Structure formats: structure tokens, C-alpha cells
């Protein structure tokens, strides 16, 4: 096991500084606050020269655009034990941080590290918060490896909050400036030791140095160091120059818009190309103004916004008259990483990525995610958002960076959580915070981890943003729900000879109430399945069985008990629907006929949720067909949507488009190849039940159809 003398004195290469801070020690990470990289090079060069002369191992972490801090080739020629690692921050925060961590871990105990300016990472991540997150992740590893590290930041490019987070964690923090031909160094934090002159400024002119202790000298220097102007986060600064919402006309403006597109909506190439066409600068500013924290809003949010903008531009009349507006909020992906860093789950996350049995670390990470705390500034923004929504029910939806992309949908892998949003502001906040943590924790559920592992995505940047939406619906007694909701595919994967057509207009799954019963299919209940080539065609069930194979339960938000509930639809027509019940249901006529034949009252005959009048008497199916057609055409790919609708007493309605993503028609693995077989036992054609597999068959069992059908239900199974 490697050990070191933690009290070993290490020179900075500057005598006056060594005297002021009582030298460096193993585990000291020094953050240099400077205005110009040349100031940092002054101290870094002297530090490297000194430790190289003593034969110490030196590692240079190179990632910035500024000039190189040290000439590793020249040092190596002089016999120095030096290594340069060139990294690209464009790979994303998580991947970049893991790369740096691996370098630190690989190097021997007590290695000396020199970093480029951390502030340059803003060019790639556009987030002040992520700069401090990176430091807070890497700093403990450096200390644990008893390294000595130099890391510069440009003091003027960071908010006070970022500087405060770094100051709190670094062992040493010092300012360095060049003024009037002299170098001034001022240590503002030295952990674990002090001398009578530690916190006095040091003036270096040529080879001479002196400590400035007189009030006149220190006033003159501190007055020039002091900055009273408010420091803007680089994220806010990026948007300040386009605050008027005008479209850019010059090359610099176009480049800035491209950066904003990538920062807000992600780098997935196919979707990004569509976003360039359908998002104006005004659209991007609107998203930014409704974002909590900073960073990408994630794939689900981007897909929803893109679909709405496509319809706005390509089908303006439909959009104006039939699409319900939304007022969603977005919790930026940077908040997820900040939450993880603040609550100490990073080490476990890295071990999970690198472990052979990655599920071993999932549960400990999940517990940390469920029981962490948020920064006060984030909590304040959460509260402000909840005040905006009032007591309208909301849903916290996962919107990870990779989610709903082309090739990796992550469908159903991450959670979404409904918040009934009733009670006092504190009660609503507590429920909302638990919902956020629950979605965060779903990033390490076994299904999600296996999905990422199968697609070799475990080491990819997968930050979790959140989409917070007002639930589409209305209050009906003690419950809140929309009249109808469901999912749609622009291509119908459930075809047979009878419903096949050359056009293939797609399909819808349709339910009464919350759309969860259409998304999360229930074994004991049924959604209405519509072939959009012939949407009014009755379900393919035997006469008299329509009620049996119809919807019997609905999902709703219980306002009285403040929870998501599943209730029976019996008697729903007698409740205050605020719409014509016959749009959605009609009497079960076979049952009515039987009751009449028996001379019994038909008053208690059940209704069937078959949506017959809705499908025959409104333009709902035409609208949904057009929505899916336009989106598929502009995506150049079949799409999968989620929707909900509310009706009024006159039959007017609007569609709330909740989600849009490329339709996943293939799983992992190679496509099957149909064999050219001339001799066969049996074959069939013309029917396709959606999804297919190619499996070796050992046995074929022939069942006599008529005797089988004569069996009672229990014997059949």
C-alpha cells in the first residue's frame, strides 16, 4: 500500500510565497484566481521547474484553447519525468470528468498536476455551475491521491456562488495579478496552517520580493483588486446578447444561436437539424426563461417542443384551432449533476460504470438520490414554480439527454410522477421534491441500466433533465382528468389483410381519463385500438363481447385524498363531465336487449366506453391523422406521440400534444433474414401483430381448432 509523509514541505519555487504559506504539502490543491493566463504561467512555471529539478512526476492536463502552460517536450529533453494528457471537453461533462478521474487514479501517489484554466470549460459547457461541479468532483480525488495540483480560474468569469463553492472545498486559494511591472500574490485561504504574514499580499519585482504589511500599501493593492460589479453567470451572459429575440444575420450571431440550440436542446444530430429549422431565437429565449437551473432540457422536452413548432409552422390552422397551448417548466440537466455532486454519489457512480457487475452499485446510488438535499437557490426556484401553478395538478417527467432520440428511445425506462398539488405550499413542495428525487433515482433502476449497457451507453453522458407539465384535464367532482388520452403511432404495426392499406395512416390507443392506461397497458382492462385507415370500424370481437373487452377502469388524480387513483367507470355518465357523455359511451345494447327479453328494467344496463359518437361525429380522427402525418413527414421517420384532450358542452376540443419521439421499430441485434424455403409444414401471410423475432423451433404443436373452441375457458389454459 502506497503511503506518503503528509507533512513533507514542497516549495512553490517562489521564496516569499513559501515563507507566507509555510510551503505546500501533499494533498494541497491550489486554485489561482487570475485575470490573464500569463499571470498563472508565472507561478506554474516556477512550480514545475522546482519539482522537476527534484525528479518528481509531473502531469499536465491540457484541454483549453489558450497557450500551453508548460513545454512538456522541452522538459522531457532535460530529463524531467513529465506527461501531457490532451482531453476534449466537448465529449460532455460526465465523460470528461471520468477521463480526468482515471488519469489521477492511474498516476502514482504524490504526483504533481498542472491544469489548464478551468474557466475555459465554459466554452463547451456554457454553465458556471458545472465548472464548480467539476472542481468539487476532482478535488477529493487529488487530495486522496496526496497530489499537489495547480488549477487556475478567471475570477471575472464566475458568479460569487461559484467562487464560494470552490473556496469552501479547496485547501489553498490565492489571487495573482500583474500591476505596473510587479507581480502581486495574495493568499485568501490556506487550510491547516498559517504564519504571521500568510494573508498579507506579496509583491515580486524581478528576483526581489517583499510582504506588504502597511495600511497604505495594502489599501492601494486591495482597492485595485476589488470588483463591485455584479458577475453574470456565463449561461445568462450568453442569452443577454440576444435578449431582443431577433434572428441573427451575421456569422457570429449564427454561431451563437447554434451554441444556444446545442446547450438547450442537445447534440443528437437528426433532431438538432430539425431544431435549426423550427426554433427561432424567440422560441429559445422562451425556453430559457422557463428553465430552473441551467443546461439541456433533455430529449423528452426537446421532442415535445419540436413537434409543436413543426405543427405551428407546417399546419398553422390546425395548430391555431386544435392544439392546446402549454406552460411547462424545465429543470436543467445541470441541476441533476449538482444534486449528485452535493450529495456525494459521484464515486459510486464511477465505480458502477467501471464495474463488471454494474447493478451492485445501483441500490446505494438510488438511496443517495432519494435522500439528498438541494441547494437553497434551486429550492427557491422550485417554490416560485409551484406558486405559479397554484393547485393545478402537475407531472414531473423524466427528460434525459439521450431520451426520445433517434435510435435510443428509453421508452418506459425512467419514471414520471404525478403531483396532485393540493394543500399548503409547504405540503405541495414536499410532494414535488419527493417526485423529483424519485425520477432522479429511476436513472439507476435495473431496466434503465441494462438498457444502457446493452447499447454500450453506460459511459455516455446521460444527465437527467426534467419536464414539469400542468396536467391536461379538468376538475370533475373530487377527481381531475382529461376526457380522453392515449398514444399514437404514425405507422400501424398491427396489420392484417382486412385493415392493410397502401397509405397506412397509423394507429391510436384511446382511453377515457388519464393516458397512463394507454401507455402502461393493463392485463385486466382494455384501451380502444384505432386503425386510422378506418377509425370508425368496430373492435374485432364477437357480438355481445364488446362490453367485456372495453375499458372498465380509469386513472384520475384524486383531489380529496391528494393521490393518483384508479377508479371504475361505472356511472361516469352521471357525474359532471362538462361535456356530452354520449361522445364517449353508449348503452351496452346486447345487454339491454337481454334485459328487455327477460322483462327487466334497462335502467341499470351498463354503458360501453367505445367512443363511437366521438369517432363518427367529430373531426378528431382527421386531426390526429394529420398531426401524425405532418410530424412523420418532417421527421422523415415514423413517430410515436402521446396526447390528451378536453371537450366542452358544445363538442369543441383541443389536443394537448404531450410527447413526440421517433417510433422504435427495432430492438437490439441484427435484423432477421427470411429463408427461401420451398418445402414447409405450414405458413401464413397477411397478418402481423407488431414486433417480430427469429427463434429456432424444436417442436410444433398442432391443435384441432373446433374441439379447442368447445372447451370451457379454464380448460383452454
Question: Where are the model-predicted features located?
Answer:
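C-terminal regions of RecA-like/P-loop NTPase motor modules
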Residues: 2-6, 194-227
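Glycine-rich P-loop/Walker A and Walker A-like loops and their local beta1-loop-alpha1 context
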Residues: 9-65
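Residue-level preference for the first positions of well-ordered beta-strands
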Residues: 27-33, 57-59, 110-112, 148-150, ...
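Conserved inter-motif catalytic segment of the P-loop NTP-binding fold
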Residues: 54-123
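Substrate-engagement module of ASCE P-loop NTPases
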Residues: 124-125, 130-157
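Phosphate-binding/switch region of NTP-binding enzymes
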Residues: 147, 153-207
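Conserved mixed alpha/beta core segments that line enzyme active sites in large multi-domain catalysts
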Residues: 156, 272, 278-318, 372-717
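A conserved helix-loop-beta module that forms one wall/lid of the active-site cleft
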Residues: 284-351, 355-376
Amino acid at each position: 500500500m502506497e503511503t506518503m509523509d503528509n507533512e513533507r514541505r514542497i516549495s512553490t519555487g517562489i521564496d516569499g510565497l513559501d515563507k507566507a504559506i509555510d510551503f505546500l504539502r501533499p494533498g494541497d490543491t491550489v486554485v489561482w484566481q487570475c485575470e490573464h493566463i500569463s499571470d498563472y504561467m508565472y507561478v506554474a512555471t516556477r512550480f514545475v521547474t522546482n519539482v522537476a529539478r527534484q525528479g518528481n512526476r509531473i502531469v499536465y492536463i491540457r484541454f483549453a484553447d489558450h497557450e500551453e502552460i508548460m513545454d512538456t517536450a522541452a522538459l522531457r529533453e532535460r530529463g524531467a519525468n513529465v506527461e501531457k494528457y490532451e482531453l476534449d471537453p466537448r465529449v460532455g461533462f460526465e465523460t470528461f470528468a471520468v477521463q480526468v478521474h482515471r488519469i489521477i487514479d492511474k498516476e502514482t501517489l504524490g504526483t504533481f498536476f498542472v491544469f489548464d484554466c478551468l474557466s475555459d470549460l465554459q466554452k463547451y459547457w456554457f454553465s458556471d455551475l458545472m465548472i464548480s461541479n467539476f472542481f468539487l468532483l476532482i478535488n477529493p480525488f487529488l487530495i486522496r491521491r496526496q497530489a499537489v495540483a495547480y488549477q487556475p480560474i478567471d475570477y471575472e468569469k464566475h458568479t460569487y456562488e461559484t467562487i464560494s463553492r470552490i473556496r469552501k472545498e479547496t485547501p489553498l486559494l490565492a489571487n495573482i495579478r500583474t500591476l505596473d511591472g510587479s507581480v502581486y500574490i495574495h493568499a485568501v485561504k490556506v487550510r491547516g496552517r498559517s504564519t504571521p504574514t500568510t494573508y498579507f499580499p506579496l509583491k515580486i519585482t524581478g528576483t526581489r520580493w517583499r510582504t506588504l504589511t502597511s495600511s497604505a500599501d495594502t489599501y492601494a493593492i486591495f482597492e485595485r483588486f476589488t470588483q463591485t460589479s455584479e458577475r453574470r453567470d456565463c449561461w445568462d451572459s450568453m442569452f443577454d446578447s440576444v435578449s431582443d429575440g431577433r434572428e441573427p444575420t451575421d456569422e457570429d450571431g449564427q454561431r451563437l444561436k447554434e451554441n444556444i440550440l446545442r446547450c438547450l436542446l442537445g447534440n443528437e444530430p437528426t433532431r438538432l437539424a430539425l431544431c435549426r429549422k423550427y426554433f427561432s431565437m424567440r422560441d429559445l429565449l422562451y425556453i430559457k426563461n422557463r428553465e430552473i437551473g441551467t443546461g439541456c432540457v433533455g430529449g423528452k422536452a426537446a421532442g415535445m417542443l419540436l413537434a409543436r413548432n413543426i405543427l405551428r409552422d407546417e399546419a398553422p390552422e390546425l395548430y391555431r384551432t386544435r392544439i392546446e397551448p402549454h406552460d411547462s417548466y424545465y429543470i436543467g440537466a445541470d441541476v441533476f449533476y449538482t444534486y449528485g455532486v452535493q450529495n456525494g454519489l459521484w464515486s459510486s457512480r464511477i465505480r458502477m460504470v467501471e464495474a463488471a457487475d454494474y447493478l451492485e452499485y445501483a441500490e446505494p446510488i438510488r438511496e443517495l438520490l432519494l435522500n439528498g438535499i438541494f441547494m437553497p437557490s434551486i429550492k427557491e426556484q422550485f417554490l416560485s414554480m409551484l406558486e405559479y401553478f397554484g393547485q393545478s395538478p402537475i407531472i414531473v417527467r423524466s427528460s434525459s439527454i439521450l431520451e426520445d432520440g433517434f435510435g435510443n428511445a428509453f421508452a418506459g425506462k425512467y419514471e414520471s410522477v404525478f403531483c396532485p398539488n393540493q394543500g399548503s405550499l409547504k405540503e405541495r413542495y414536499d410532494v414535488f421534491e419527493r417526485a423529483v428525487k424519485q425520477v432522479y433515482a429511476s436513472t439507476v433502476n435495473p431496466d434503465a441500466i441494462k438498457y444502457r449497457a446493452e447499447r454500450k451507453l453506460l459511459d455516455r453522458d446521460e444527465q437527467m433533465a426534467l419536464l414539469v407539465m400542468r396536467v391536461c384535464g379538468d376538475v370533475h367532482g373530487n377527481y381531475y382528468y382529461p376526457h380522453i388520452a392515449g398514444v399514437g403511432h404514425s405507422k400501424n404495426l398491427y396489420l392484417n389483410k382486412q385493415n392493410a392499406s397502401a397509405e397506412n395512416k397509423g394507429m391510436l390507443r384511446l382511453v377515457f381519463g388519464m393516458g397512463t392506461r394507454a401507455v402502461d397497458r393493463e392485463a385486466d382492462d382494455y384501451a380502444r385500438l384505432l386503425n386510422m385507415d378506418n377509425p370508425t370500424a368496430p373492435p374485432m370481437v364477437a357480438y355481445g363481447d364488446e362490453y367485456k373487452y372495453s375499458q372498465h377502469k380509469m386513472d384520475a388524480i384524486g383531489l380529496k385524498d391528494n393521490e393518483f387513483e384508479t377508479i371504475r367507470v361505472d356511472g361516469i355518465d352521471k357525474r359532471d363531465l362538462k361535456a356530452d357523455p354520449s361522445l364517449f359511451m353508449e348503452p351496452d345494447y346486447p345487454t339491454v336487449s337481454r334485459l328487455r327479453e327477460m322483462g327487466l328494467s334497462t335502467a341499470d344496463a351498463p354503458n360501453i366506453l367505445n367512443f363511437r359518437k366521438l369517432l363518427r361525429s367529430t373531426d378528431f380522427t382527421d386531426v390526429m391523422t394529420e398531426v401524425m402525418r405532418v410530424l412523420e413527414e418532417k421527421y422523415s421517420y415514423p413517430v410515436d406521440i402521446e396526447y390528451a384532450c378536453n371537450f366542452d358542452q358544445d363538442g369543441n376540443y383541443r389536443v394537448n400534444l404531450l410527447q413526440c419521439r421517433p417510433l422504435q421499430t427495432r430492438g437490439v441485434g441484427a435484423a432477421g433474414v427470411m429463408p427461401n424455403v420451398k418445402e414447409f409444414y405450414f405458413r401464413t401471410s397477411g397478418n402481423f401483430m407488431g414486433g417480430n423475432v427469429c427463434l429456432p423451433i424444436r417442436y410444433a404443436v398442432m391443435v384441432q381448432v373446433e374441439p379447442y373452441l368447445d372447451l370451457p375457458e379454464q380448460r383452454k389454459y
